[in-house]
Amino acid sequence: MTIIASIITLSNPKQSTTGSVSTVSAAFKFGSNSVSCGGSSGSGSGLLGGNKGLLGLLGGLGGSPNSKVGVNIGGGMGPQTGSMMGGGQPNYCGCN
């Protein structure tokens, strides 16, 4: 997990000002998203996938844009996702 975290951190160095509050350890926060809060607005990357994320093609955990609650698993299709299963839907709260 540490290696994956390092790769994602290097690939997504920018931190988001939205969706950054997390009840879990800061070690689980990568790029512009946190595990508990999903993602940032716009084209921010999701955790292990997400909106145009590093592992978007593999799906998995992906933060949705403007998400405030929960972890978005998988996600929908469309320009917001970056892939069929990677990432989530805009303004989505909860577990998708």
Curated annotation (Swiss-Prot):
Disulfide bonds: none annotated. GO terms for biological process: sorocarp development. It comes from the Eukaryota. It holds the Pfam family Coiled. Belongs to the hssA/B family. This is HssA/B-like protein 25. The gene is hssl25.
